[in-house]
Amino acid sequence: MLNLTRTAAIGALACALSAPVLAEAPDDNPGFEKDREAILAMAGNYDVTFDFRETVPLAEGYEVKEPKLSGGYEIVRVIEDTGEFISLQHILVVGDEGEEFPIKHWRQDWTYEPSEVLTFIGGNAWEMRPVPASESEGQWAQEVYQVDDSPRYGAVGDWTHDNSVSQWTPPAEWRPLPRRDMTTRDDYDAVLAVNRHTITPFGWVHEQNNSKLVLDENPHVLVREIGVNTYRHFEDYPVEVGDDYWTATKDYWAGVRAEWEALEDAGEPFGLTMQGEPEALYQPLLELAGEVEEGTTPTQDAISEASDVIAEYTTTEIGTLSSRVNDAPEKEDGAY
């Protein structure tokens, strides 16, 4: 279990149950309800391990780095289910026994037969990419969001249920650096990733086949990496710590999501006004959630302040990919 103080954990990791909807299956996809069951099966209480290992160096002189292993307790809750849209919120429960506290983690949104999908375009910038009907038929988009509900990446793929195994695998898509590398490395700029979500008898597994990209005048792959995030059903920790946090803050986070959704819905590419680790953005938003949880700041006041923070650190004047990548700050001495 993670052993962190509340302040340290927020920095280190910023890297109400909802009843399922009985959705009517589309006439052209009898597997629709199986798809939904697989997505909803990812909700629950878990002991999670995160295992990332570089495997194949592809740039001359590059040496594979040590594996990065971590883990913790995590609850996953269905926060919205309208049939063809499902949203799952992850919340970590960390700290010593008897002193556990919650940390809002990532969110995954699932949309059936999407007309567009969130796409990372490098250098802390995103756009909504149109998805032709021929590509979205029978497919699900997964869009992933950061701890502060800012965007991370998205992709469109097919849930399959062959040989009694439910899994979703999309084509490769770009994504930002993970926080485990964002704070320590400046030798690559983006990840070309293939995801696989697989439902297992013990929970589910998120597999990643990652290629770490250098986006200079000669774009190339630095190294390949395999990631396996394993979610095992586990109840022997105070899951109510996470649930109580969500009950207290869910209206605030709904307001924050609305601010980000407005940027997506505007139809223009958008990005952050900073490159590298966006602590100046996520830290105030998490702190405002803490104030709402403690009752020291009213929810609507916190949403208004969060809106100002998001406005300060976002822009539609994103420039070129080259300019964004070159503006990324250098990491501290000793980073690799």
Give the ranges of each region predicted by the language model.
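Hydrophobic/aromatic beta-strand elements that line small-molecule binding cavities or substrate pockets
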Residues: V64-E66, S70-E80, Q89, R107-D109, ...
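Acidic, serine/threonine-rich low-complexity disordered tracts
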Residues: D189-Y336
